Amino acid sequence: IYSRYPIIRKYAFADSISTFNFGGVMIDVDGKPVRVFNTWLHYLPDMRLAPTDKSKEEILAWEMEGTRDEEIHKILSVLQPLLAEADSIPIIMGGDFNVHSHLDWTEATRNLYLHGGAVVDWPVSIAMEEAGFKDSFREMNPNPVANLGVTWLTDADSLETECRMDRIDFIYYQGKTIQAIASECYDNSLGKTFTFKGEDFFYPSDHGFVLSKFELD
């Protein structure tokens, strides 16, 4: 986590969280505390291989063969004391969740974006929603038909199968004193030039990214 605001506290859960990455900080935004967390859930099972020709139950059974659902519930469990304070100290949680969102795999998109006719309640995004988190991008861009918000796949992927372009990177938030006011997704290919705000950069990732702007009361 990089911050232009002072980091006044760090949060680590090495004894209870075994994901690829999870941790956070508290930052001081002009006198207002905000907790910011970053996570990276397991990449298996590979979303590129989701069996969209199967039933909803079979797709969910395939997803549950991995550990992402267990990981997100452990994360939400250790966050409970902080979530209880979210109305006074807002929380932002972003990262590579390595799984789709139920907000994107809807009746309206079932025959778009190579979804193969599937409508899926992906459990990780459901868990985040049930824990009180808002998906900042989908809140600001509520129509997945008009704006899917692709963050993956890019040309860097070499798996020899027909690939969907989808959204598996998210910025969630919650709290009464914070509100998303803008959010965009950007996609680019690893190693290619990326132009952002008039400047050219070497792009260092095989994922795109999400840029969300928040307002604090």
Sequence positions of predicted segments:
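Extracytoplasmic/periplasmic, Sec-exported soluble proteins
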Residues: 17, 63-67, 71, 116, ...
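A solvent-exposed, charged loop/short amphipathic helix patch at secondary-structure junctions
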Residues: 46-66, 108-109
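Metal-dependent phosphoester-hydrolase catalytic domains
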Residues: 81-92, 99-217
